[in-house]
UniProtKB/Swiss-Prot annotation:
Organism of derivation: Zea mays
Subunit description: Homotetramer.
PROSITE patterns reported in the protein's UniProt record: SOD_MN
Keywords: Manganese, Metal-binding, Mitochondrion, Oxidoreductase, Transit peptide
Family: Belongs to the iron/manganese superoxide dismutase family.
Catalyses which reaction(s): 2 superoxide + 2 H(+) = H2O2 + O2
Function: Destroys superoxide anion radicals which are normally produced within the cells and which are toxic to biological systems.
Subcellular location: Mitochondrion matrix
Gene: SODA.3
The protein's name: Superoxide dismutase [Mn] 3.4, mitochondrial
Length: 233
C-alpha cells in the first residue's frame, strides 16, 4: 500500500512539477482533487464573459478534467499494485493533460474578478513597478499578451510569469493543458488566460482577439500582486 499511495500522491507532481495541491483522499489512500468553488456568481463577469460560458466552463469542462484526473490516479494506483510498468507509463499522458487542466483552471478562476469588486483595476505596488521595469508599461504588457494569445495556434494558455531565479517577469505560452511549470521549474504563474475555444466561442465566435481585449476588464490584479509578493518574500 505504501508504494501505491506514494505513486498516487506523486503522480501529478511527476507530470506537472509539483504544481497541484491535493484536496481529498479516497478510501484506498489515492490522493485526488476536487472542483473548486468560484468566489463569484457565473454571471458576475458579464459583459466581458457571459454567465453561460462561465457555467459551462466551470461545471462541464473543468469538472471533466477533475473527474478524468482522479480516474487516471486510481488506474495508476492499480497499475503500480500489479507492477504493470507499461500501464504506469501510458497513464502519464492522461495525468498530465487532465491534471494540467485542473491546475490551469484553478488559477484562471482566481485571476478573474467582477468589476464591482475591483476587477480590471490596473496593478499597483511592487507588481506594477515590476511590469513597468520589465515591459516598459502596463499597456505594453497587455499588448504583448494579447498578441501572444491571438497568435497561439490551436488551444492553449498565455501566461504572465515570474521567473524566481532572475526575479524577472515574462510572457509565456503553453499548448493544450500544459501547465506553466512545463516551461521551467522556476516559473510561477501570476496570471493565465485560457485561449481554448470553450473559453470564448459561445460569445465571441472565432474572434479570439475580441475576447482577449475584453477579459482585461475583469482581471484580478490584486491576486496576481499577492502571489508576486509572496514568492519574493
Amino acid at each position: 500500500m505504501a508504494l501505491r499511495t506514494l505513486a498516487s500522491k506523486n503522480a501529478l507532481s511527476f507530470a506537472l512539477g509539483g504544481a497541484a495541491r491535493p484536496s481529498a483522499a479516497s478510501a484506498r489512500g489515492v490522493t485526488t482533487v476536487a472542483l473548486p468553488d468560484l468566489s463569484y456568481d457565473f454571471g458576475a463577469l458579464e459583459p466581458a464573459i457571459s454567465g453561460e460560458i462561465m457555467r459551462l466552463h466551470h461545471q462541464k469542462h473543468h469538472a471533466t478534467y477533475v473527474g478524468n484526473y482522479n480516474k487516471a490516479l486510481e488506474q495508476l494506483d492499480a497499475a503500480v499494485a500489479k507492477g504493470d510498468a507499461s500501464a504506469v507509463v501510458q497513464l502519464q499522458g492522461a495525468i498530465k493533460f487532465n491534471g494540467g487542466g485542473h491546475v490551469n483552471h484553478s488559477i484562471f478562476w482566481k485571476n478573474l474578478k467582477p468589476i464591482s469588486e475591483g476587477g480590471g483595476e490596473p496593478p499597483h505596488g511592487k507588481l506594477g513597478w515590476a511590469i513597468d521595469e520589465d515591459f516598459g508599461s502596463f499597456e505594453a504588457l497587455v499588448k504583448r499578451m494579447n498578441a501572444e494569445g491571438a497568435a497561439l495556434q490551436g488551444s492553449g494558455w498565455v501566461w504572465l510569469a515570474l521567473d524566481k531565479e532572475p526575479k524577472k517577469l515574462s510572457v509565456e505560452t503553453t499548448a493544450n493543458q500544459d501547465p506553466l511549470v512545463t516551461k521551467g521549474a522556476s516559473l510561477v504563474p501570476l496570471l493565465g488566460i485560457d485561449v481554448w475555444e470553450h473559453a470564448y466561442y459561445l460569445q465571441y465566435k472565432n474572434v479570439r482577439p475580441d475576447y482577449l481585449n475584453n477579459i482585461w476588464k475583469v482581471m484580478n490584479w490584486k491576486y496576481a500582486g499577492e502571489v508576486y509578493e509572496n514568492v519574493l518574500a
